[in-house]
A protein has these predicted regions:
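Mixed-charge, glycine-accented linear interaction segment located at domain edges/termini
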Residues: 80-109
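General beta-strand recognition
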Residues: 51-53, 80
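Acidic surface patches and DE-rich sequence motifs
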Residues: 9, 46, 56-58, 83
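Short aromatic-glycine-(Arg/Gly/Cys) micro-motifs in beta-strand/loop hairpins
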Residues: 2-3, 65-86
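Negatively charged, low-complexity tracts enriched in Asp/Glu with abundant Ser/Thr
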Residues: 2-51
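Short, charged, intrinsically disordered terminal tails
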Residues: 6, 11-14, 100-111
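Short, hydrophobic/aromatic-rich beta-strand segments within well-structured domains
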Residues: 53-54, 67
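Short, charged/polar surface micro-motifs in flexible loops or helix N-caps
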Residues: 47-50, 57-62, 72
Length: 111
């Protein structure tokens, strides 16, 4: 008797952060942790977006999200920094430049 052959759906690679991108993000994260502003983070790799979420406490909703959306690279930029209220703080194609919007908040909190 022949066993039925399962039909495999095409595999889709999830979007993820490269090592160099994570290095830039974690460097900023470390500075905020040292300042006592951030305490936890989460990384999600989904089909069309990679998300780095920053939390003040583990059980809360994220304070900020750094998203990588390859489909938006040509239109509005590969990276997006989103605030707690869902507002887009910065969009662009250079991660270091886009994260400056958060570095300004670090300078304010230290002063």
């Amino acid at each position: 008797m022949n066993a039925p052959t399962p039909i495999h759906s095409p595999t889709h690679d999830n979007v993820h952060f490269q090592r160099s991108e994570l290095s830039v993000i974690l460097s900023l994260y470390g500075r905020f942790v040292a300042a006592g502003e951030w305490r936890d983070y989460g990384i999600s790799a989904l089909r069309d977006v990679a998300v780095f979420s920053v939390f003040r406490r583990t059980a809360e909703q994220p304070m900020f999200r750094i998203e990588k959306r390859p489909k938006m690279a040509a239109k509005q930029g590969l990276y997006c920094v989103i605030g707690m209220d869902g507002r887009i703080l910065r969009r662009g194609s250079d991660l270091k430049t886009d994260l400056r919007v958060l570095e300004r908040k670090l300078i304010r909190s230290v002063n």
